[in-house]
């Protein structure tokens, strides 16, 4: 019998089909890249629904996986990065075939999300203190929100020429 928690439904969701286990170096970055690929092909309403569904499933799956493997916030759990990165793209990434902008905003959203996810400034670091799957997911949700807001600010200043002073 295989006792690997990856081969359970929770494990497959938490590790995004095992991707987090396959990619040994920087699995979180792999999760963010996977989310960027999804963002290019999913219209925004579908992305919003995916965020809600994956966040709810992610809390359950990440918590169950964490408990099964006996480690706190295991690195191979990357469903949180997928959700956080998708949040960072909302309002920015155009869908292929619906006008330009996909690459223009996906790359900065990716870089900003990875920045907030790795450095974990407040409130990101406070969110990861929540217990179990909630803490695993919540810090990346906060990182995604901060990345999204930062990208909006950068767009306003550098692209739209808006300056509040």
Language-model regions: role of each:
Residues 1-71, 75, 82-165:
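Hydrophobic alpha-helical transmembrane segments
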């Amino acid at each position: 019998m295989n006792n690997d928690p990856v081969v359970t439904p929770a494990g497959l969701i938490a590790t995004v089909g095992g991707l987090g286990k396959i990619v040994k170096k920087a699995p979180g970055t792999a999760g963010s890249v996977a989310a960027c690929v999804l963002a290019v092909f999913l219209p925004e309403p579908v992305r919003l629904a995916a965020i809600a569904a994956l966040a709810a499933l992610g809390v359950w799956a990440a918590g169950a996986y964490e408990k099964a493997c006996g480690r706190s916030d295991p690195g191979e759990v990357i469903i949180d990065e997928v959700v956080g990165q998708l949040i960072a793209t909302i309002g920015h990434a155009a869908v292929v075939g619906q006008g330009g902008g996909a690459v223009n905003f996906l790359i900065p959203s990716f870089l900003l999300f990875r920045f907030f996810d790795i450095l974990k400034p407040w409130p990101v670091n406070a969110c990861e203190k929540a217990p179990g799957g909630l803490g695993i997911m919540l810090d990346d949700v906060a990182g995604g929100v901060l990345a999204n807001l930062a990208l909006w600010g950068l767009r306003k200043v550098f692209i739209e020429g808006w300056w509040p002073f």
